[in-house]
């Protein structure tokens, strides 16, 4: 998997930055922005097993960078023939004091030592960016992140040129236009992968309609 250092090199090459006009901090910030956009379109899916330490409807999770839960099983027992038989939808997820917190409104209240299994969408990461220890980006999506980050970096630099003396006529507008085009191509790609993503956002359970609505 590609590390931050490799991404920096590729972004600089895309910018044809032979004179080091783009600082590492600018490139990292540009990459950070496109990574966040990429996550919204194509999150990284992970699993987490939460052992209940205190019985109750409210359970605080330690799962990092949790965006949305796509599957929850309680009680979870991996020794069963079908450990996912007790899948639940009678819960809400909210952030309380910065921590993902579950609230179960059904009749089955989690008890001490029971296990809650969750599958969830999480933030995508790149090794060494913001201390991440793994790169989760698909290899075939790397090119488009480089394209988007190069576009972001160009627009950031163009904004700075507006405050500088001695710039060449038209340099700022040309750079801004180029950067915007690259970033627009990146956003178009995100629309494509959103359509490919299989992210269940609707519950399987339904309410019966009233007799007069049938």
Residue ranges of model-derived segments:
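Glycine-enriched, solvent-exposed interface loops adjoining structured elements
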Residues: 1-214
């Amino acid at each position: 998997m590609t590390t931050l250092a490799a991404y920096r090199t590729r972004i600089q090459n895309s910018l044809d930055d032979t004179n080091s006009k783009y600082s590492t901090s600018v490139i990292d910030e540009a990459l950070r922005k496109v990574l966040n956009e990429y996550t919204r379109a194509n999150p990284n899916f992970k699993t987490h097993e939460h052992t209940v330490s205190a019985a109750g409807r409210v359970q605080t999770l330690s799962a990092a960078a949790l965006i949305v839960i796509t599957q929850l099983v309680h009680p979870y027992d991996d020794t069963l023939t079908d450990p996912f038989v007790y899948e639940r939808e009678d819960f809400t997820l909210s952030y309380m004091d910065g921590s993902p917190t579950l609230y179960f409104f059904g009749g089955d209240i989690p008890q001490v030592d029971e296990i809650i299994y969750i599958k969830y969408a999480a933030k995508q990461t790149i090794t060494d960016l913001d201390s991440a220890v793994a790169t989760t980006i698909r290899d075939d999506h790397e090119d488009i992140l480089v394209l988007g980050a190069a576009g972001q970096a160009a627009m950031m630099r163009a904004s700075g040129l507006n405050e500088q003396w001695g710039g060449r006529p038209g340099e700022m507008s040309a750079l801004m236009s180029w950067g915007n085009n690259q970033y627009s191509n990146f956003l178009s790609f995100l629309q494509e992968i959103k359509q490919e993503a299989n992210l269940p956002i609707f519950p399987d359970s339904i309410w019966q309609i009233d007799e007069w609505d049938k």
